[in-house]
Regions:
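Membrane-core helix-loop-helix motifs of multi-pass transport proteins
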Residues: 2, 158-249, 413-445
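Long, contiguous bundles of hydrophobic transmembrane helices that form the permeation core
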Residues: 4, 210-298
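Hydrophobic mid-bilayer segments of alpha-helices in multi-pass membrane transport proteins
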Residues: 12-17, 31-71, 90-97, 248-254, ...
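Core transmembrane alpha-helical segments of multi-pass membrane transporters/permeases
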Residues: 75-107, 128, 132-133, 300-334
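Membrane-interfacial loop-to-helix junctions in multi-pass transporters
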Residues: 89, 117-129, 161-165, 309-313, ...
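Membrane-embedded helical hairpins/re-entrant loop segments and their flanking transmembrane helices
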Residues: 106-137, 149-163
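Membrane-interfacial helix-loop connectors
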Residues: 150-161, 188-198, 345-404, 418-420
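Transmembrane helical segments that form the transport core of multi-pass membrane transport proteins
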Residues: 255-372
């Protein structure tokens, strides 16, 4: 079969999964559960030959182990198909959410950002924190695409002494976006599994995102003191003024307000609201700005380049969802609380430590955080471990975010390693201390502000 035909089949299958999922959410027609699950099984079989290495073995392990567990539990056909469809929300998000990033890349905004960066971020701390904050803001809308965009801004003028520190800032900024972006797989997975609206966890996650900035600066403050920056540019020497692009600021703020307003007014799942907003809001913005050519190019690039590049993640996430469903059929959700009761600490505290250690520990050895998060969110009843659903959501999202910068399998670490011409471990290692401090900060934050 010709590669072009195969690629078209894969795209059609992925779009079909999203379409059936949306139809199921709108109609609640139960037969669609079987169609959706069947499409997922077909997609995994079709995409499996494209996988290599750890991703291939993990996907196969999840499918085989999940099938064995369901067979041992004598689960009926409905459970099999429901389990297969657990993570289709993420596939749907992959299809639509990246469209929000098209207006962010408008040439006028990128040029204005370059000047803003060059003129305003002159001190070492300002450059470090500004890079992290900008990556976080851009990451909310363009996901991993924020890394090359901000990288080009940061490294327009080489800063040899700060290369690795700025890479840390990029890495941790992306982790901050994981904490609160409604367009990320992490938020979709956790809020969907726990039945929470995004707005209910947003205040806590924004607080945690601010905490991550402080912890990041604290961890690297000693190194920042001993670095000499390059000479400022002529624009900076002349003290020219450069403000953050007004249009881009309005676009970013309005995108969040649109989602918050839709969540309150329209009684639909968050994923469907994001799909609706992603199809209309960026298109309308580019139309008003007279940048429809940029929109068409961005849309075409998303369908023909970005989506095919996500085949590995899509297959792994679907397999992880199936495995999570099989775990949910067992008594795993009851076993964990009963084991934790033997430890002489409050169950909520013990479970929090266990969760952070599990997600961070498995990420450290190369397992994607979605795997433990899917299992925990899908099989543990927060009330059984004496915590609230919101506490559980903050715990899972916080653990995922602090694990991302230390994972050798994360897309960000691999992308930065390529850009900096270093090994992925050289990029990840400086973040170990950050992850440890954030883990401690997360525990304190949960116990003081979120509570049980």
């Amino acid at each position: 079969m010709a590669p072009a035909v195969k690629a078209a089949m894969e795209r059609t299958l992925i779009f079909s999964i999203a379409a059936v999922y949306i139809a199921l959410q709108l109609t609640k027609f139960e037969l669609l559960i079987y169609l959706l699950g069947g499409l997922v099984f077909v997609a995994i079989v079709l995409l499996l030959p494209k996988l290599k290495g750890m991703t291939l073995w993990l996907t196969m392990s999840f499918m085989v182990t999940g099938a064995v567990l369901l067979w041992l539990q004598k689960a009926d056909a409905r459970i099999w198909f429901e389990s297969a469809g657990i993570n289709v929300t993420i596939v749907t998000l992959f299809l639509f959410a990246p469209l929000f990033g098209i207006p962010v890349r408008l040439p006028a905004y990128v040029e204005a950002l370059k000047k803003f960066y060059e003129v305003n971020l002159r001190s070492k701390s300002a450059l470090f924190l500004g890079t992290q904050l900008l990556t976080q803001l851009m990451g909310v809308f363009i996901n991993v695409g924020s890394i090359p965009v901000v990288y080009q801004l940061v490294y327009v003028k080489p800063q040899p002494g700060m290369n690795l520190l700025l890479a840390n800032a990029l890495n941790r900024g992306f982790a901050g976006a994981i904490l609160w972006s409604p367009y990320f797989a992490a938020m979709t997975l956790v809020t969907s599994a726990l039945g929470l609206p995004w707005s209910s966890v947003l205040p806590y996650m924004l607080g945690l995102a601010i905490l991550s900035l402080f912890v990041s600066w604290l961890v690297d403050s000693r190194e920042l003191l001993h670095i000499d920056l390059a000479e400022p540019s002529q624009a900076a020497k002349k003290k020219e003024r450069a403000v953050f692009p007004f249009g881009l600021g309005i676009y970013l703020i309005a995108a969040i307000i649109v989602i918050l307003a839709m969540e309150r007014v329209i009684d639909l799942p968050m994923v469907l609201l994001i799909c609706l907003a992603a199809l209309s809001y960026p298109l309308l913005w580019c139309f008003v700005k007279g940048e429809m050519t940029v929109y068409k190019e961005g849309f075409k690039n998303h369908v023909t380049v970005t989506l095919p590049a996500l085949r590995k993640e899509i297959t792994l996430f679907l397999a992880a969802g199936f495995f999570s469903g099989s775990i949910g059929v067992t008594k795993f959700g009851e076993i964990v609380p009963s084991l934790l009761e033997h430890i002489p600490l409050p169950v909520a505290v013990t479970f929090s430590i266990f969760t952070v250690a599990l997600i961070a520990g498995t990420s450290l050895i190369g397992l994607h955080p979605i795997v433990p998060v899917t299992i925990l969110a899908g099989s543990i009843d927060p009330l059984h471990v004496q915590i609230s659903p919101i506490y559980f959501a903050v715990l899972l999202l916080g653990s995922w975010a602090l694990s991302n910068p230390i994972s050798p399998a994360s897309a960000v670490n691999n992308l930065l390693a390529g850009l900096l011409k270093k090994t992925v471990f050289e990029v990840a290692m400086p973040n170990y201390k950050f992850a440890a401090c954030m883990a401690l900060g997360l525990m304190i934050y949960l116990l003081i502000l979120v509570k049980f």
